[in-house]
A protein has these predicted regions:
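Conserved TIR/SEFIR loop-to-helix hotspot centered on a Trp-containing motif
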Residues: 107
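A hydrophobic, small-residue-rich beta->alpha segment in the mid-to-C-terminal subdomain
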Residues: 153-154
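Nucleotide and nucleotide-moiety/phosphate-recognizing core
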Residues: 2-104, 113-129, 136-144, 157-200
């Protein structure tokens, strides 16, 4: 069993914002796998099979900073192990068009990830970071305004392709594990002209 959890804020006000790219990737997974969401405890939940693996796609409906509050529910219902949970979220330290898989790590200042670490009791869970680019201002207010802003028209074409790449990466995690997925996807980057492969 694998859990693919996209982070974001619920409601129309936040649709299409940089902070909600995790939700967008979760929606892309649901579409790719031909399934639909149902309502779980404080989350939207979809079920699918990838080859012989049961997959649950999860979007917490708690608002970003409380994302981890659904972890006890997932654990009590399905006994989710940290290594089987891929958390998908936005990252200001990566440029738009770049994704990065990691097997573990700190929150990097991301409050949704911080909440998941708290409720899981460990930093040892895989994550898929989606680049949203750095803000012009690095102060806290500037960063908050930035993550709640929408992508420019030029960025939208890139982020659409990036979402598809992230869906591919998440499914590679399900099929092949985190290390193989990292090898296949961490060196790839989407540009505004074409999809390119670059080596680090």
């Amino acid at each position: 069993v694998k859990f693919l959890m996209g982070l974001g804020n619920p409601g129309p006000r936040y649709e299409g914002t940089r902070h909600n790219v995790g939700f967008a990737v979760a929606d892309g997974l649901v579409e790719r796998l031909g399934t639909t969401y149902s309502t779980g405890y404080r989350c939207a939940l979809a079920r699918a099979n990838v080859d012989s693996t049961r997959v649950y796609i999860v979007k917490p409906m708690t608002y970003m900073n409380l994302s981890g509050e659904i972890i006890p529910y997932l654990r009590s219902r399905w006994g989710v192990a940290p290594e089987d949970l891929l958390v998908i979220f936005d990252d200001m330290s990566l440029p738009v068009g770049k994704i990065r898989l990691r097997p573990k790590g700190s929150s990097g200042g991301h409050n949704g990830v911080k909440s998941i670490i708290y409720h899981l009791g460990t930093e040892h869970f895989p994550r898929l970071r989606i680049g949203i680019g750095p803000p012009d201002s690095l102060d806290k207010n500037g960063a908050v305004d930035y993550v709640l802003s929408r992508f420019s028209s030029q960025e939208l074409a890139v982020i659409g392709k990036t979402k598809n790449l992230a869906v591919d990466a998440a499914l590679a995690f399900v099929r092949d594990g985190i290390e193989a997925a990292m090898s296949a996807f961490n060196s790839r980057q989407i540009t505004d002209t074409e999809r390119t492969d670059t080596s680090d």
